A protein has these predicted regions:
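N-terminal charged segments
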Residues: 1-73
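Short amphipathic alpha-helix that is part of the acyltransferase structural core
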Residues: 1-18, 56-61, 108-111, 115-155, ...
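Acyl-donor-binding surface of acyltransferase catalytic domains
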Residues: 21-22, 60-127, 132-134, 228, ...
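A short helix-loop-beta-strand connector motif used in the catalytic cores of GNAT acetyltransferases and
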Residues: 27-34, 76-78, 105-108, 160-170, ...
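Conserved beta-hairpin
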Residues: 34-39, 89-103, 166-179
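A conserved beta-turn-beta hairpin within the catalytic core of GNAT-like acetyltransferases
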Residues: 45, 49-56, 105, 185-193, ...
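Conserved acetyl-CoA-binding loop-helix of GNAT-fold acetyltransferases
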Residues: 64-69, 194-197, 203-220, 243
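A conserved beta-strand-loop-helix scaffold within acyl/acetyltransferase catalytic domains
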Residues: 149-199
Length: 297
């Protein structure tokens, strides 16, 4: 079990680092992308996008708290996650984070694993095919909207199209791309980082079909297991993604707790000028010991 947990963390770090580093230069500059590896930890930051998903620290231990918080603080980023595996709940790490004003986020994540084997009984009226480079704009827009990111972040999420280790698949409705999903592979492991469907194409089997396509590709490449994650169920909030993972054969692997500056919440950044607004917004300065409270939904 612990080996699988380590593998799931490792391939997630590798996939997102790969995407940040290999995105086109203009995208890296536009979003303020940076990746910093510190021992077993990886810091992913997008200084011009005020969104939790693109500003995260993975694999931080007790000796890495100062470096992780300092990375985001020095880059002027006030909204970020520091991920912590549930096995560290009773270590000194939570206390060290709280001392810096980094507190538990309301929703933890569940990491999932399943064999890299095809799905049975996949029915979808839409056409499923591998994504092409000229699909990039549509794929990026769908994925960005699916994760409440500004449209300018779309090129980052679609940056893996055509790159080695990455495979993207799309669902078409009369030649219009209406859903997209990606898979990153490395040796025995596959990682499914994101997928999304436009509202009008939901309830048509797109995501199950895209899952089948990705798992089939993982098996074709010789992968043994596939990893992914989604938010834990929270009372009063939708949890369809969690249920869908179980329906397609994923097993719960481990809970990952998320820590963020006090008051941070997920929020929607759909507007085309969101990045300009983010870049112009004042940022908190000084240490987090003062208990900075950030606005958000």
């Amino acid at each position: 079990m612990q080996q699988l947990i380590r593998r799931s963390e490792s391939i997630e770090r590798a996939a997102w680092s790969n995407l940040y580093r290999r995105a086109p230069w203009r995208v890296r500059r536009r979003l303020g992308l940076r990746v910093l590896d510190r021992g077993e930890a990886t810091f992913l930051s997008a200084s011009r996008v005020d969104h939790l998903l693109l500003n995260r620290a993975i694999g931080v231990g007790s000796d890495g708290v100062a470096a992780a918080v300092g990375h985001f603080e020095q880059r002027g980023i006030g909204r970020f996650w520091i991920h912590m595996g549930s096995e560290l709940r009773y270590s000194e790490l939570p206390g060290l984070l709280r001392e810096r004003g980094i507190t538990p986020y309301p929703r933890s994540w569940m990491k999932f694993v399943r064999p890299a084997a095809p799905l049975d009984e996949v029915k979808c009226a839409l056409r499923i095919r591998p994504a092409r480079r000229n699909d990039g704009a549509q794929v990026g827009e769908i994925l960005a909207r699916g994760f409440d990111l500004p449209t300018e972040a779309g090129p980052l999420l679609a940056a893996g199209i055509g790159l080695d280790q990455w495979d993207y698949f799309v669902a078409e409705d009369e030649r219009e791309v209406v859903a997209a999903a990606a898979i990153y592979t490395r040796g025995d492991d596959a990682y499914l980082p994101f997928a999304a469907t436009v509202p009008k194409a939901r309830q048509k089997g797109c995501q199950r079909a895209l899952m089948a396509a990705r798992l089939g590709r993982a098996q074709q490449l010789g992968c043994r297991q596939a990893f992914t994650e989604t938010g834990m169920p929270v009372a009063g909030e939708p949890s369809s993604s969690y249920r869908n993972m179980l329906r397609v054969g994923f097993d719960e692997l481990h809970v990952r707790d998320n820590f963020a500056p006090e008051g941070c919440r997920w929020h929607n950044l759909p507007s085309s000028d969101a990045i300009a607004k983010s870049a112009a917004s004042p940022r908190p300065s000084g240490t987090w010991l003062k208990g900075v409270v950030l606005s958000g939904s």
